[in-house]
Amino acid sequence: MIPEALRKQALIAYKHGLRATRVAFDGDNRVLLAARAEMRKGMENPDSSKTTQEQIQHLEEVATFLKRNLVQGQKIEGEEKYHLKIHKDIELGDNESIKQPTKFKARPFKKCSDN
């Protein structure tokens, strides 16, 4: 039997997951229903190799990922372009980390014949 406190945490995580799917898959009912069915299946038949706390943490991480990092696109008819559905919760990076030089230098290329 799962303690009441963990049951409440699991229910809260499940609700967060449902909300995240609504945000991430808004307007795409097929994917929304599939994601929710998968989430429900995970709640009804949890992975026995993980503790309840680990499962709750995983569900919270999935919900956060869906809400902040998943962007859906829809092809614009007659064009080779897509309209991205970016909402207020999406993390928008500034690409500053890409501009920073790496601290590792590339090794010189060595041929087999150099032996």
UniProtKB/Swiss-Prot annotation:
It comes from the Eukaryota. Belongs to the complex I LYR family. MZM1 subfamily. It is found in: Mitochondrion matrix. This is Mitochondrial zinc maintenance protein 1, mitochondrial. Assembly factor required for Rieske Fe-S protein RIP1 incorporation into the cytochrome b-c1 (CIII) complex. Functions as a chaperone, binding to this subunit within the mitochondrial matrix and stabilizing it prior to its translocation and insertion into the late CIII dimeric intermediate within the mitochondrial inner membrane. Modulates the mitochondrial matrix zinc pool. Its main location: mitochondrion. Keywords: Chaperone, Mitochondrion, Transit peptide. GO terms for molecular function: protein folding chaperone. The gene is MZM1. Signal peptide: none annotated. Residues 102-115 have a biased composition (Basic residues). Residues 96-115 are annotated as: Disordered. Interacts with RIP1. It comes from Candida glabrata (strain ATCC 2001 / BCRC 20586 / JCM 3761 / NBRC 0622 / NRRL Y-65 / CBS 138) (Yeast). One of its GO terms (cellular component) is mitochondrial matrix. GO terms for biological process: mitochondrial respiratory chain complex III assembly. InterPro entries: Complex1_LYR_LYRM7 (IPR045298), MZM1/LYRM7 (IPR050435).
